[in-house]
Amino acid sequence: MTIIDCNKEMRGYHSEEVNLSNAEQAEMRGRRDNGRTRLRNGLTKAGHPLPKEFSSQGSYAMRTMVQDDACDYDIDDGAYFDKEDLKNSEGDYLGALDVRKRVRKALKDDRLAYDAVVKTNCVRQMYPDGYHIDIPIYRTTCSKDIWDNDIIEYELASGDEWTKSDARKVTSWYNDAVGNELKAGESDTSQIRRITKLTKKMARSRNTWKKKTTSGICISKLVVDNFVARSNRDDDALRDTWKAIKLQLEVSQRITHPVFTDKNLAEEGDECVIFFRECLGEVLETLKVLDEHDCTSKKAGDAWDEVFNTTYFSAQCTTDNTTSKSLLRPAVAATASLSFPSYPVQPNKSSGFA
């Protein structure tokens, strides 16, 4: 445990510059809901069946999105259709690409600045503010096992194929990993969740890092696998978790999928994972100043500023020092206005305990 305690500053930084504000979250929910309405209306107008349900996924659902100066936010909102509802006019099942094209056409709205585009695993709707909504499309199949129980499977329209997948399982995995407190309400009471967001913030703290570093799900998996809890010390928990992650990535860059054991999020030698490991090495080197015997609050604040490419921590140190000086300033000036009696003052009660 480092001598200089920066937990207060780290919690403040997370609250003010990492965590999304309620207003930002509300705006994103509004865009998401408008997109759902637009898709329903477009499909209805074309005479196509509607999705049976929508389900938010990814960092939005896991509550691990972080603030971005360029509003480069990615909201994943899955659309789930019954397989029997995804047929063409001849009654043949639609291919994965054809389904994405149908959804893209249904989202068409002349009032929007950008048309939706078909991507490999989703249909993407861009917005002028900088962020976008990705709509992965799933089809649901239902069969029976030998005991006549229902078996429900989900397939993602990926490329030209339908592949077994359901991102909601990843959300469940993360929520189970960080604790039940994440499943109730807006409050952020989990240290591991804060560490996840702080790590993502660091990984994207420079424009030159954003396009080179690894994905949010890879970072989340690495944090969960290597998390080091430090009660009431988010600064120590963050640093120790980073050390553990770097050690793992020095041995192997392969990151296993949290749900599907036959898949990997990243393979050996993955360039984005290697870049993330190098970034970790840089920031951990910067933080070595915390171990010096003569480390001060200012030095610690400057180090954390460099790590996150911010001025927040040093500003807090300046504010704290100003407050301390005002509290400790001698009251010499005030004595001039004080007057003292020239005669003995008798106490108004007897000595001792009354």
For each of these PLM feature ranges, what is it?
Residues 53-58, 124-127, 218-222:
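Extended hydrophobic secondary-structure segments that form protein cores and membrane-embedded regions
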Residues 1-14, 254-354:
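Terminal (often C-terminal) interaction modules
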Residues 11, 73-85, 170-182, 197, ...:
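Glycine-rich, often proline-containing surface loops adjacent to acidic residues and nearby aromatics
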Residues 66, 131-197, 350-351:
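Extended, alpha-helix-rich binding/interface surfaces that flank or overlap catalytic cores
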Residues 26, 39-43, 62, 94-147:
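Conserved catalytic core of two-metal-ion nucleotidyltransferases
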Residues 1-72, 79-98, 353:
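N-terminal regions immediately upstream of nucleotidyltransferase
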Residues 187-299, 303:
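Conserved nucleotidyltransferase catalytic core and NTase-mimicking acidic/glycine-rich helix/loop elements
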